Amino acid sequence: MAISDLLNRRVRAAPDEDEEVYSDESASGSEPPSDEGSSDESGSESGRDSLNGSDNDFDSESQNSEASDSISEDEDDDGDVKSSLNNISFGALAKAQASFAPQTKRRTKNLKDNEGTTASPLDDIRAKIQEAREQKRKASLASKDSSAKSRVDKPPPRTSKHAPTVQSSKYAVSRKRTIIEPPSVPKSRDPRFDPTIVGGRGGSGSSAPSDAYAFLDDYRAAELRALKEQLAKTKDVRRREALQREIRSMTDRLRTIENHKREKEILSEHKKREKQLIREGKKATPYFLKKSDIKKQALLKKYEGMKSKDRAKALERRRKKAAAKERKEMPMERRGLGGDSDAAPSKRRRMA
């Protein structure tokens, strides 16, 4: 049987089986009368009920026979349909299914048509309320999504400025790779922070850098001698003044370097003495020298190493320096050397 014949075949619906209704009266009529002395009216009524019951039984039997015939015919048709469907390809079934419109679309269209015909102001208000709720729900979802994204993108704030910064580890792997290593460029080394000099020999407070670069002092001394010789040979006034300034600055630099060396020596000797006293048990805690004490001891050590003539010159120079400092701190009226009190105070000359 072809698929077109199967689709165009008319099928008769099977009639529903009516439930057999048996009334109490028919049931009582079928039963034999219990009271023999009943009246004639009761006998006639029972006869009518029995006739009605027999008619109902005949009708039910006829309906049952028709239903059984229709069921048998349907079973035969179903068998033929199944045998023919087994021989149909899936492509033909798909085409047949696509030719029919889905029932859901039909139902929705019918419902929309019914709603359009029975529209009322109350329905419009309900629809507007529903739309407002839907918009509010979408806005809340969008705000939640944006807040979640901002929380993900923005790292949490630090507890304090000393706390380590939080950085995400989700970084793409770099697609660049070094094929040829560039040649190593020699870097300039600072002796103050060079680990080969400072770090390897007792830390930053040690005298390792000064010992390693002690030859610079010899260079400075040689340069100072060359400048003095050049000053003796030069007759130009401007050139002589420039050489004198340079010699003065260099001597001051050398004097400062010597003072620093002297202070370091004093501090190292003091530390050794304190460690020895603690080791012997004479002291429990060390005594740390103040900067003023270190400077005083360095000055005493400097004067002890000088000759008597040089020491006198140095003391005189130091006295003049202290007097000039005190004079600057005095008020203008007391800076004179003992003249008339009515005389006008001497004004300080400005240096150009």
Curated annotation (Swiss-Prot):
**The entry's keywords:** Coiled coil, Nucleus, Ribonucleoprotein, Ribosome biogenesis, rRNA processing
Q: Where is the composition biased (Acidic residues)?
A: 33-43
The UniProt entry's GO biological process terms, in alphabetical order, are: maturation of SSU-rRNA from tricistronic rRNA transcript (SSU-rRNA, 5.8S rRNA, LSU-rRNA)
> Which interval of the chain is the signal sequence?
none
Where does it localize? Nucleus, Nucleolus
Query: Where would you say this protein principally sits, based on its record?
Result: nucleus
Coiled-coil residue spans = 221-280
* Region described as Disordered: 1-209, 303-352
List the biased-composition ranges (Basic and acidic residues): 123-134, 146-156, 303-315, 323-337
Q: List, alphabetically, the GO terms of the cellular component aspect.
A: 90S preribosome; nucleolus
**Keyword Signal part of the UniProt annotation:** no
Superkingdom of origin organism:
Eukaryota
Q: How is the quaternary structure described? A: Associates with 90S and pre-40S pre-ribosomal particles.
* Protein family (similarity comment): Belongs to the RRP36 family.
What this protein is reported to do is described as: Component of the 90S pre-ribosome involved in the maturation of rRNAs. Required for early cleavages of the pre-RNAs in the 40S ribosomal subunit maturation pathway.
PANTHER family attached to this UniProt entry: RIBOSOMAL RNA PROCESSING PROTEIN 36 HOMOLOG (PTHR21738:SF0)
Name used for this protein in its record: rRNA biogenesis protein rrp36
Organism (species): Emericella nidulans (strain FGSC A4 / ATCC 38163 / CBS 112.46 / NRRL 194 / M139)
Q: Could you tell me the gene encoding this protein?
A: rrp36
